[in-house]
C-alpha cells in the first residue's frame, strides 16, 4: 500500500503539471487552427482566438527559419491541427528551403497557409515571391495575400507600417479566417 506522503506528492506533481500546461494547447485540437508568427500575428491574437484559433504561437522578432521547428514541436505534442497558418518574414528573409521544410513538416494531410508580408523593408518583395512559390509547389499549401489585401488601407497599420491597429487586427483575422474557410 502506498505511503500517504508519496500519494500526496504524486497529487501535487499532477496539479503542478496541469497548472504549467499552456491553457490553449488542448484548444488547438478542438479548434483545428494554429497560428505561427511574429509580433504582427501576436497583435491580432485576440481576434484570431475569436475566429476559432486554438493556439496562436507568436512571439516578437521570430524569424521564418523557426517555422519548421515550431510545426514539428506541435506535431510532437500531438496537437498539430488540420490548419496551420504561418506569418513570418517581417523580421528577415524567407529562405525557400525553410518554407518547404515547414510545409513538409506539417504533412500532406494538413493545410498550411502562408501569409504574405506588408512590411516596409527591402526583403518584402523577394520574401513574398518565395512565399508564393512555396504555396504553388505543395498541394497542401495555400497563400493568404495579406499584402494585396492591406496595401491600400493605411489605417490598418501603426506608424511603422506593418504592426496592426485595432481595425487592422480585425481585418487581418477576418482575411485569414475567410481563406481557411474557402479550402475544403
Question: Which stretches of residues belong to each language-model region?
Answer:
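Hydrophobic/aromatic beta-strand patches that form the interior of the parallel beta-sheet core
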Residues: 34-36, 113, 142-144
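N-terminal secretory targeting modules
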Residues: 1-34, 41, 46, 77-80, ...
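A short helix->loop->beta-strand "cap" motif at the edges of active sites that frequently abuts
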Residues: 108-111
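Conserved beta-strand termini and adjacent loop/short-helix elements that scaffold enzyme active sites
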Residues: 57-59, 115, 144-149
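Catalytic His-Asp segment of secreted/periplasmic serine-dependent ester chemistry enzymes
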Residues: 124-184
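Conserved SGNH/GDSL esterase-like catalytic core that processes O-acyl groups on lipids
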Residues: 27-101, 119-126
